[in-house]
Amino acid sequence: MKTFMAKKEEIKREWYVVDAKGKVLGRLASEIAKILRGKHKPIYTPHVDTGDFVIVVNAKDVVLTGKKEDQKIYFFHSGYPGGHRLITARDMRAKSPEKMIYLAVKGMLPKGPLGRKMLKKLKIYAGPEHPHQAQKPKELNI
C-alpha cells in the first residue's frame, strides 16, 4: 500500500468560527493551531497546507489562569540598540486583545514559509461580530 500524499489542489477547506469568551488562552490556541495545520483531517500531510480557516470572535474575553494577567510579559524588539519594549498581558489586552491569541497560535505553528501560510488563515476579532458570513462558517466548540 502506498503512502497517501495530499496535493494542494485536492484539499477542500472549511471555515470555522470559535468563540473565545471564557476559554483559557493556551488551550484555545493549541486547538486552533491543530485546525490551521490540518491535523484533524485524515488526509494530513506534514509538507502540505491541509488546514482550514478559523475565525475567532470575542478575543477580548479570553482567560489567563493564575497571575499571568500581571506577570506574563510580552517582549518586542525593533532591531536597534536599546530598542526593546516590554508589555504585560493586561496592557496587551487593553491595547490589542487580538494580538494575544495571534502570538499564542503563531508560536504553535511551524516556523518558515508553510507556517506563515497557515497563519494567514487565522482571522481574529475582539468583539462578537465578523465580516465572514458569506463563507458560511461552522460553529466549533472547543
Curated annotation (Swiss-Prot):
UniProt-recorded name of the protein: Large ribosomal subunit protein uL13
GO terms, molecular function: mRNA binding; structural constituent of ribosome
Assembly with partners or alone: Part of the 50S ribosomal subunit.
Gene3D superfamilies on file: Ribosomal protein L13
Keyword Zinc belongs to the record: no
Purpose: This protein is one of the early assembly proteins of the 50S ribosomal subunit, although it is not seen to bind rRNA by itself. It is important during the early stages of 50S assembly.
Pfam family, one: Ribosomal_L13
Family statement: Belongs to the universal ribosomal protein uL13 family.
Cellular component, GO annotation: cytosolic large ribosomal subunit; ribosome
Keywords: Ribonucleoprotein, Ribosomal protein
Signal peptide: none
HAMAP family (alphabetical): Ribosomal_uL13
Organism: Dictyoglomus turgidum (strain DSM 6724 / Z-1310)
InterPro entries referenced in this protein's UniProt entry, alphabetically: Ribosomal_uL13 (IPR005822), Ribosomal_uL13_bac-type (IPR005823), Ribosomal_uL13_CS (IPR023563), Ribosomal_uL13_sf (IPR036899)
Cross-referenced NCBIfam families: rplM_bact (TIGR01066)
Keyword Thylakoid: no
GO biological process, one term: negative regulation of translation
